[in-house]
Regions:
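Extracytoplasmic gate region of multi-pass secondary transporters
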Residues: 34-35, 213-266
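Conserved MFS/SLC helix-loop-helix module at the cytosolic interface between two early adjacent transmembrane helices
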Residues: 65-101
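Helix-to-loop junctions at the C-terminal end of transmembrane segments
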Residues: 66-78, 267-280, 365
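Cytoplasmic helix-loop-helix junction between adjacent transmembrane helices
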Residues: 109-145
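Intracellular juxtamembrane helix-capping segments at the cytosolic ends
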Residues: 119-132, 321-335
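Helix-loop-helix hairpin linking two adjacent transmembrane segments in secondary transporters
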Residues: 134-135, 139-191
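C-terminal transmembrane helical hairpin of 12-TM major facilitator-type secondary transporters
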Residues: 281-326
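A late C-terminal transmembrane helix in Major Facilitator Superfamily
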Residues: 333-369, 376
Length: 408
């Protein structure tokens, strides 16, 4: 009899998997490229930091206007085609920015990055779940690690180039060349069928009843919005809160985000192992959202340097360590025939939150920074409530195989 502890994490589609993970590594670079090269680009386009901030906003716009479109395309024409579209858009950006003559064209290239991210998400997430049908949670949570590694590596590259007076453009051309290599690998790679093999499907939880879009579907989307908002609020406002209420200096307060990043990476690797062997994504989502809720309450009630540093680490672990990705995995289990559409809807709502939350927190900051932490607690609590709803519905919709001993 098969046991979960012997679950294989191998796949015959290894080249496709490498392409996807490597693309996410470079995607992590792409979303911070403009900010990391802000001074050089401001000089190039004869603008100021506000002008580059406007340029960066094009990434969010590109993502919002395209993600639903690519969800349909991915389900209809396949994952490879959509990922190739993403790579082409990334190539336009990385090779185009150094040669771009003005800010208007550069904004168009920033929009290309947002479009590329939409295409990569709607092709990459479903493809990983199809490559690893028995370990989809572990497969998608590693996406978070690859993005984080890219965002850790690129600032070091930019710093090295600045210290050695190397032209900033090489910092864009190098990722562009790597995307050329990914293109060649994609053309030779093999992708799985969008339908799970019957022999594999029999070992997975079987549907006992039809999932309800208005209940677990809506709850899953709300979970994604709440989870995203929980860590977004902390990463933007924790330093200011720590300075105002914990008496920390600016330099000390900024270090809270380093603890946040460490927590995020620690969670990714812990749960990548646990999800493969003994823990279901739905269990991980309930646990992490409960932990985030408790932590946000403690940060509000007992602000101190220790609490702010430890709280940032725990929020990074619980809210930014991959539960956004696990939410996609769980929602795709409920609606397996529309994985890319599910991903696009889920990620689009996160994009809307990315637009709305800064407006809300900006307003609250004028009233009192403590109310921003109250808002963060509210989002964490919403994530917990929706995670519990999805958890309870999971066992009504699915029949769990007797030989499956995963907790949750």
């Amino acid at each position: 009899m098969r046991t979960v502890t012997k679950l294989s994490f191998s796949t015959p589609f290894i080249l496709a998997v490498l392409c996807i993970y490597f693309s996410y590594f470079l995607h992590g670079i792409s979303v911070i490229t403009l900010a990391q090269n802000m001074t050089s680009l401001a000089e190039k386009f004869s603008t100021d930091n506000a002008g580059i901030a406007y340029l960066i906003s094009g990434i969010g716009l590109g993502r919002l206007i395209s993600i639903l479109f690519f969800g349909v395309i991915s389900d209809k024409f396949g994952r490879r085609a959509v990922i190739l579209m993403a790579v082409i858009m990334y190539l336009l950006f990385f090779f185009g920015i150094p040669a771009c003559p003005n800010l208007t064209l550069a904004y168009g290239l920033a929009v290309c990055v947002g479009i590329a991210n939409s295409a990569l998400d709607t092709g990459g997430y479903p493809a990983l779940m199809e490559c690893f049908p028995k370990a989809s949670g572990s497969a998608v949570i590693l996406v978070k690690a690859m993005v984080s590694f890219g965002q850790m590596f690129y600032p070091m590259l930019v710093s090295y180039m600045l210290l050695n007076n190397i032209w900033y453009g090489y910092g864009l051309i190098i990722p562009g060349i790597l995307f050329v290599l990914i293109t060649l690998m994609l053309l030779k790679s093999k992708f799985p069928s969008q339908l799970v093999d019957a022999s594999v499907a029999n070992e997975l939880p079987q549907m006992n009843s039809k999932p309800l879009v208005w209940l677990e579907g809506v709850s899953s989307v709300l979970f994604g919005v709440a989870a995203f908002s929980t860590f977004y609020v902390i990463v933007v406002w924790m330093p200011k809160y720590a300075m105002a209420f914990a008496g920390m200096s600016e330099a000390e307060a900024l270090k809270t985000i380093s603890y946040y990043s460490m927590g995020s990476l620690v969670c990714v690797f812990i749960f990548a192992a646990l999800l493969k062997k003994m823990v279901r994504p739905i269990w991980a989502n309930v646990f992490n959202s409960a932990l985030a809720t408790i932590t946000a309450a403690i940060i509000y009630l007992y602000p101190s340097p220790l609490v702010c540093n430890a709280g940032a680490f725990v929020i990074g672990f619980s809210a930014a360590g991959g539960i956004l990705q696990l939410g996609v995995s769980v929602m795709s289990e409920f609606f397996p025939k529309s994985k890319a559409k599910v991903t696009s809807i889920y990620m689009m709502m996160g994009g809307l939150a990315n637009f709305v939350i800064p407006l809300i927190t900006g307003y609250l900051s004028n009233i009192g920074l403590q109310y921003i932490i109250v808002l963060d607690f509210t989002f964490a609590l919403l994530a917990l409530i929706t995670a519990i709803i999805v958890f309870s519905r999971y066992y009504r919709v699915f029949i769990i195989p007797e030989n499956d001993v995963q907790f949750g």
